[in-house]
Regions:
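Helix-rich terminal scaffold detector
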Residues: 1-80, 84-89
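Flexible glycine/proline-rich
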Residues: 50-179
């Protein structure tokens, strides 16, 4: 795999359109962060909607929304949220599985541990928690803001509770993926 940093793109419609047109056949995959919402000022999502085949444009994970995955001929585009933890979650669970399909899913690296916390969550989302593992119990980081990278750098891994569950009870077994 060869990786190229294409720099920071100004949030300008003309520059975004030129950038994507210039690079659309140069790379197998282009991954960007920021500009993936569908507001009038999100020029990346606008360009991808108009010029590529949208494979999906939302995921039901937190942190992680919104995400665009699209295709044009043999080129693929991932437009990830601007939030750093949402970018990490999507890179770990979506992009890496796309790049390395032999992994199929994360079940081979998933373990179950007891939750050291209780929390209500939206039942229509899979939620990821940055956690510390201590004596076989998972604890969330004190810093819960999704833009706070310290919680990721100090975490042992991600615990996740799938869609369909609206709460986590202390002592309940939950899934954990160690970094």
């Amino acid at each position: 795999i060869s990786v190229h940093d294409l720099g920071i793109l100004k949030d300008d419609e003309i520059k975004v359109n030129k950038f994507y047109k210039k690079n659309q056949n140069k790379f197998d995959i282009i991954i960007s962060s920021g500009g993936s919402s569908f507001s009038s000022k999100d020029y990346i999502s606008s360009f991808l909607s108009q010029n590529t085949e949208l494979l999906f444009k939302y995921v039901r994970i937190q942190p992680g929304r919104p995400v665009i995955f699209s295709k044009l001929k043999f080129n693929y585009y991932f437009s990830l949220p601007g939030n750093p933890l949402a970018v990490f979650t999507n890179l770990f669970f979506l992009v890496s599985l796309f790049i390395d399909p032999s992994r199929k899913d994360n079940s081979s690296i998933t373990k179950f541990y007891q939750s050291g916390f209780s929390e209500n969550k939206k039942s229509n989302l899979t939620k990821f928690y940055r956690v510390k593992l201590s004596k076989n119990i998972l604890y969330t980081h004190n810093s819960k803001g999704s833009a706070k990278l310290i919680s990721l750098s100090e975490a042992d891994g991600l615990a996740f509770v799938p869609e369909g569950n609206d709460k986590i009870k202390k002592g309940e077994k939950i899934r954990f993926i160690e970094f």
